[in-house]
């Protein structure tokens, strides 16, 4: 399974999340997943909300276009981004 898949104009990301990091960033590959560090703690859905906001900003889409498909309660997540207007360089290289 690939970390990043383009499906019918949507982007499907298999992510490994590192909560409580010093800053928000796309770290790179972590096995067959893309590692994303976020500053929010994994308490009461704060990390998921922060992840959605961070990805929406990175891909220049509304938060409503970022859907967590799998992994609501874990570090391993599958996220769909509907019709991204921008693809960060770290992810664009994985699509090639």
Swiss-Prot record:
InterPro entries: DUF167 (IPR003746), YggU-like_sf (IPR036591). It comes from the Bacteria. Signal peptide: none annotated. This is UPF0235 protein Shewmr4_1190. The lineage of its organism: Bacteria, Pseudomonadati, Pseudomonadota, Gammaproteobacteria, Alteromonadales. GO terms for cellular component: cytoplasm. Belongs to the UPF0235 family. HAMAP family: UPF0235 (MF_00634).
